[in-house]
Design a protein with these regions (language model features):
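A nucleotide- and high-energy phosphate-metabolite-utilizing enzyme signature
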Residues: 1-174
Length: 174
């Protein structure tokens, strides 16, 4: 059994175990279409493949998701490698800001069309709600992470605090 095949099988077994329907329901919902290359891509890739994909082929939404990425287990050497890759991707200086803003705005419109609401109790999807706050943070991180690495936090509240401290947005806007 080759390394790639082994890790693909291990990943599938892990996914099956956390998504299995039990008497209490499912532990987690996992949408494996949301991975590099979608359903055509492998379930598990090498660190080098992950890095190459993120540098050259990843979509804006994938980098937005990466702003929340974190290593939850594994040896310190592996954690450091992955965190370094994530940091380097998020702080890449060659990002086209106009295109980035357009892509983020387009995604937000698409989400609003599919999940938007006028219900004031829907704190997540209402205009000005949690999703808008997260999109503002994610855009700000991708647009400014090269100049202000201190803003590259995983937690939205910490991101907002660092964005305010760096004076990227005014205190009133934050």
């Amino acid at each position: 059994l080759g390394v790639n095949h082994y890790y693909a099988r291990l990943s599938q077994n892990f996914i099956n175990s956390i998504t299995a329907l039990t008497a209490e329901g499912k532990l987690y919902e996992v949408d494996m279409r949301l991975r590099p290359s979608g359903t055509a891509g492998p379930l598990a890739v090498s660190i080098e493949s992950f890095n190459d994909y993120q540098k050259g082929q990843a979509w804006t939404w994938e980098h937005m998701a990466l702003t929340r990425g974190r290593v939850i287990s594994g040896p310190d050497t592996l954690r450091i490698k992955i965190e370094t890759i994530i940091h380097n991707i998020l702080s890449h200086p060659g990002r086209a800001h106009d295109n980035l803003l357009h892509e983020v705005a387009k995604m937000r419109v698409k989400l609003a069309e599919n999940f938007g609401t006028d219900n004031i109790w829907s704190m997540k999807n209402i205009r000005g709600g949690i999703i808008d706050i997260e999109f503002i943070c994610q855009y700000t991180l991708l647009a400014n992470g090269d100049k202000y690495p201190s803003i590259l936090k995983r937690n939205t509240l910490r991101q907002l605090k660092e964005i305010k401290k760096a004076k990227i947005l005014s205190a009133d806007d934050v």
